[in-house]
């Protein structure tokens, strides 16, 4: 059956490439968000003062305002953390600060805010970075700050209110749940669907899904539906799948929506001496566990279609809609898988 607004597999790449270019041309801020590689090329060729060398540590690598937001842990806690770590490496933290500062400046410019407002935004960014090194924050639980701004508290409340039911209403159809094909979700090739079934037959994926639904490790798991997921900006064109799985059986059966995303080599400069996983999916998961533990604990590295890295995530990077906050509370059934091209 042909679905309205859907795209067949053989037409994907042409449309995705066009859409990526269109999104990046929409505004200066959108261009900054979607041009990670060019950002680092610009830094390399800039004749300005040398970038200070910070301690070698895990960095986001693509730290812009769109990659920060509420993230939930498996037990329901919420915190503002990094939500996309495709570019994460062990590198220089100054790169994250410069990229985030540029993103904030472009967002302010696109909103016609005065220069003094932009300066204040950048000052607050540096203040926040410095505050993280104070003894008072060393043992502070994520998201537990009493000094959280009113706007951030509102964002956190909205995120906490978005349940699996809301997400299911947006993405799943019918009594026998399916992923609705259309503008956002597209049909898979036969070999892609077969690869998904094989992927979710693996024990590691079973444990990830059952843990999110508070089920035993040996609880039955079956793939109910899967589709290509049209999502992102600079990542458009990479393999990304939405997979709906059922965990358990009978009245105890619950559903999980899994995000399977291809991982590729990072453009962010990495430390020449630090040891980190060579597999791109394993690198992303390791970076997520270090920088965004709420996200990292719902992610796993795997292989799909012979590609050495896909990172399945149970609500890994979250399953957000547009600019809405992602929610993946325990029992809400969100998951993810990461994979990389070797």
Where are these regions (language model features)?
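Sequence-structural signature of the catalytic-core scaffold of metal-dependent phosphohydrolases
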Residues: 135-205
């Amino acid at each position: 059956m042909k679905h309205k607004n859907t795209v067949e597999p053989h037409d994907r790449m042409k449309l995705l490439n066009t859409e990526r270019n269109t999104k990046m041309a929409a505004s200066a801020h959108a261009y900054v968000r979607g041009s990670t590689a060019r950002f680092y090329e610009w830094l390399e060729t800039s004749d300005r003062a040398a970038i200070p060398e910070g301690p070698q540590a895990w960095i986001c690598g693509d730290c812009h305002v769109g990659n920060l937001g509420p993230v939930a842990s498996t037990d329901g806690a919420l915190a503002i953390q990094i939500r996309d770590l495709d570019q994460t490496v062990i590198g220089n933290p100054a790169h994250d600060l410069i990229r985030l500062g540029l993103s904030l400046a472009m967002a302010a410019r696109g909103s016609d805010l005065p220069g003094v407002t932009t300066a204040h935004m950048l000052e607050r960014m540096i203040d926040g970075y410095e505050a993280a090194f104070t003894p008072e924050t060393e043992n502070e639980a994520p998201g537990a700050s009493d000094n959280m701004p009113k706007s951030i508290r509102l964002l956190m409340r909205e995120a906490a209110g978005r349940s699996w039911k809301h997400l299911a209403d947006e993405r799943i159809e019918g009594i026998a749940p399916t992923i609705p094909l259309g503008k956002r979700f597209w049909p898979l090739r036969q070999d892609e669907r077969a690869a998904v079934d094989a992927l979710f037959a693996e024990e590691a994926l079973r444990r990830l899904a059952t843990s999110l639904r508070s089920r035993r490790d040996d609880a039955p798991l079956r793939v109910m539906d899967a589709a290509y997921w049209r999502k992102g900006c600079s990542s458009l064109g990479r393999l990304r799948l939405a997979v709906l799985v059922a965990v358990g059986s009978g009245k105890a059966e619950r559903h999980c929506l899994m995000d399977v995303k291809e991982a590729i080599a990072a453009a962010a400069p990495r430390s020449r001496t630090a040891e980190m996983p060579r597999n791109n999916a394993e690198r992303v998961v390791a970076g997520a566990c270090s920088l965004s533990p709420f996200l990292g604990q719902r992610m796993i590295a795997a292989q799909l279609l012979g590609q050495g890295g896909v990172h399945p995530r149970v609500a890994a990077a979250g399953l957000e809609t547009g600019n809405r906050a992602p929610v993946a509370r325990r029992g809400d059934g969100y998951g993810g898988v990461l994979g990389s091209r070797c």
